[in-house]
């Protein structure tokens, strides 16, 4: 029987995929075949001609490839998987079955999501620049308990939190020590990709500080956005300072770190308008947000220390990181099952498209200037040499 025959192709691929992703072993071969049938090309598997490995590597490490991904392509009035994502999966399947792609190479560059039944590129976060900034080795390492979640198709917060208990504990302890040395008032910013766990760790930090009798407040960066109509008219990207009432933002951070009460813009997320005009003045009828002085002030946002001009004002800069496969499983549970937030195929396209782009423009740059990185998947706390020296003395 030809390896391209549907039954034989599925049999060989199933065997190899169980080694690439242990969760495949929880599927019966016929269930695997059901899922695979959705990706069979019109001309059959023999019609797929795999590209050279070096060409694929170059493609998936080029931002232009991700810019070209469509998140809402339609066929017969329904959203379908982007053709580039589909073709990548088909080539990897065929390359595995024929032996043109060895399992180690596929595992190194890609991960397979069972629930979405597609391949995604593994995003590299710890670049040479980041590693040099952090002194080349973790400050502390623990058992990698997220490995216990490899066979899960989706992950809830309870099991995620349990897997991260040790590294979260040392993070909280380390931040408390840094605050004791650097003093208050202090700005604390936690950045990280979607579903990495940053919202939950911030809530836990806040609770710890309040239990210790410290006054805590927060500044939400999105409140400094200018009107969306203006940004769209000017083609302004929302990650840049041009999208913000930046002078107000900078002055607000300066003032609150000196114990002053601040009045900041209020952004209306329904109408996408700011309480302030482009000159930073309160509009007629606008209502600002008043923030009282505090010991610890969280900056809420995805890129709190991406803006070079305010980095020096942020007393503690943390990146909370979780690898893409775990984050994707968290989002299946949180955003699809619980929140019913996305149409599933739209979600697959969007997650595939966004991770490389966001790592390149937001997270790796922040990792290169932060004080600490929590790698929950690697179960390690990374710090700069300066911070490591402080923590060793306290």
Describe the residue ranges of each PLM region.
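Long, basic/Gly/Ser/Thr-rich N-terminal segments
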Residues: 1-160
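Small-molecule kinase domains that catalyze NTP-dependent phosphoryl transfer to phosphate-bearing small molecules
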Residues: 75, 79-100, 104-109, 339-386
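N-terminal pre-Walker A segment at the start of P-loop NTPase domains
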Residues: 153-179
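P-loop (Walker A) phosphate-binding loop of NTP-binding proteins
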Residues: 193
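Conserved lysine of the Walker
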Residues: 198
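Post-Walker A alpha-helix
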Residues: 201-202, 206
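Conserved nucleotide-sensing/catalytic segment adjacent to the nucleotide-binding pocket
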Residues: 217-279
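ATP-dependent NMP and nucleoside kinases share a basic, alpha-helical "lid"
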Residues: 282-337
């Amino acid at each position: 029987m030809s390896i391209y025959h549907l039954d034989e192709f599925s049999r060989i691929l199933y065997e190899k995929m169980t080694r690439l992703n242990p969760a495949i072993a929880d599927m019966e071969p016929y269930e695997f075949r059901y899922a695979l049938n959705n990706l069979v090309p019109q001309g059959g598997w023999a019609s797929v001609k795999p590209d050279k490995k070096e060409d694929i590597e170059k493609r998936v490490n080029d931002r232009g490839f991700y810019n070209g991904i469509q998140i809402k392509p339609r066929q017969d009035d329904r959203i379908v998987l982007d053709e580039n994502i589909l073709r990548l999966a088909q080539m990897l399947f065929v390359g595995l079955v024929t032996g043109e792609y060895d399992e180690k190479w596929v595992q190194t560059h890609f991960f397979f999501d069972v629930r979405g039944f597609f391949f995604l590129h593994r995003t590299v976060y710890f670049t040479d620049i980041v590693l040099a900034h952090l002194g080349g080795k973790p400050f502390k390492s623990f058992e990698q308990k997220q490995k216990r979640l490899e066979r899960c198709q989706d992950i809830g917060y309870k099991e995620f939190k349990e897997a991260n208990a040790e590294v979260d504990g040392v993070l909280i302890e380390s931040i408390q020590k840094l605050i004791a040395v650097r003093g208050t008032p202090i700005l604390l910013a936690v950045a990280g990709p979607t579903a990495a766990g940053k919202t939950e760790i911030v809530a836990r930090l806040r609770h710890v500080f309040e239990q210790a009798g410290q006054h805590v407040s927060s500044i939400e960066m999105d409140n400094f956005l200018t009107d969306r109509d203006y940004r769209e008219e000017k083609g302004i990207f929302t990650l840049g300072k041009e999208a913000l009432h930046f002078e107000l933002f900078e002055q607000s951070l300066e003032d609150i770190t000196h114990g002053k009460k601040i009045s900041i813009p209020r952004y209306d997320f329904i109408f996408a308008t700011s309480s302030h005009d482009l000159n930073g003045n309160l509009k007629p009828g606008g209502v600002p947000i008043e923030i009282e002085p505090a010991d610890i002030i969280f900056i809420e946002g995805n890129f709190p220390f991406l803006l070079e001009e305010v980095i020096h004002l942020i007393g503690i800069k943390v990146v909370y990181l979780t690898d893409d496969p775990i984050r994707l499983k968290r989002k299946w549970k949180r955003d699809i099952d619980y929140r019913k937030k996305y149409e599933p195929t739209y979600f697959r396209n969007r997650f595939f498209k966004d991770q490389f782009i966001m790592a390149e423009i937001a997270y790796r740059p922040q990792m290169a200037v932060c004080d600490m990185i929590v790698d929950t998947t690697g179960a390690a706390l990374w710090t700069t040499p300066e911070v490591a020296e402080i923590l060793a003395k306290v």
